[in-house]
Amino acid sequence: MVKPENNLNQKKTKIGILGGTFDPAHKGHLEISKQAKKILELKNIIWAITKQNPFKNTSKTDLKNRIKFAKKIIGKNNFIKVKFYEEKVLSNKTIDLINYLNKDKKFEIYFIMGADNLINFHKWYKWKSIIKKCNLLVFDRQGYKAKSLKSVTYNGVNKNRLSFINFKKVNISSSQLRKI
C-alpha cells in the first residue's frame, strides 16, 4: 500500500477574512463577501469581529449584539463564518489573527477591505508582514479609489499581492448607518 506524502503537494484552502467592528453589519459587508467568494472561489469568508477598531472611537453597540446582528445579516450564506478571535489570539492585531489562523499553513488567505482602509493601511501594526502572509482584496468605495491608488500602501506593495475590485453595488458604511 502506498502511503500519501505529507502536505507538501496538497492544495491550500482559499479563505477570506473581512475584519472590523461590524457596528453594524450591513448588506455591503454581505455583498462584498459574495463577490469575493465568486471572484476568488473562496471556500469560506470569516467576518472577524473586533471589540474595538484602534483607529476609531468606541463602538456604540456591545460585542454580543454586534455578533448576533452579523449572523442575522448573513442569513443562509453558510460560507460566511462570524467569529470573535481576540480571546483565543490574545490580540486585536490583524497580523496575530493571520498567524493564528494559518499556524498549520493550510490556508491561502485573502484579507478583504474597502478602499478607504487601504489609504491608512501603512499605519496598521506590522502591515508589511500582513501583505507577505496574505493577499489583499480591496473593494472600491465611492470617493476613495483615486486616493487609495496614491496611498503609501498601494505604492509600496507588490501588485501581485493586491487586487483592486471595482464595486458599485452598495455604497454605505457602518458609520453612515449609525448616523441614521
From Swiss-Prot:
Keyword NAD found: yes
GO biological process: NAD biosynthetic process
Pathway noted in the entry: Cofactor biosynthesis; NAD(+) biosynthesis; deamido-NAD(+) from nicotinate D-ribonucleotide: step 1/1
SUPFAM superfamilies: Nucleotidylyl transferase (SSF52374)
Presence of keyword Nucleotide-binding: yes
Highest rank taxon of the organism: Bacteria
InterPro entries: Cyt_trans-like (IPR004821), NadD/NMNAT (IPR005248), Rossmann-like_a/b/a_fold (IPR014729)
Enzyme class, first EC level, given as a word: transferase
E.C. designation(s): 2.7.7.18
Molecular function in Gene Ontology: ATP binding; nicotinate-nucleotide adenylyltransferase activity
Keywords attached to this entry: ATP-binding, NAD, Nucleotide-binding, Nucleotidyltransferase, Pyridine nucleotide biosynthesis, Transferase
Reactions this protein catalyses: nicotinate beta-D-ribonucleotide + ATP + H(+) = deamido-NAD(+) + diphosphate
Stored PANTHER family: NICOTINATE-NUCLEOTIDE ADENYLYLTRANSFERASE-RELATED (PTHR39321), PHOSPHOPANTETHEINE ADENYLYLTRANSFERASE (PTHR39321:SF3)
Record function comment: Catalyzes the reversible adenylation of nicotinate mononucleotide (NaMN) to nicotinic acid adenine dinucleotide (NaAD).
HAMAP family assigned: NaMN_adenylyltr (MF_00244)
Similarity comment: family membership: Belongs to the NadD family.
UniProt protein name: Probable nicotinate-nucleotide adenylyltransferase
Organism: Pelagibacter ubique (strain HTCC1062)
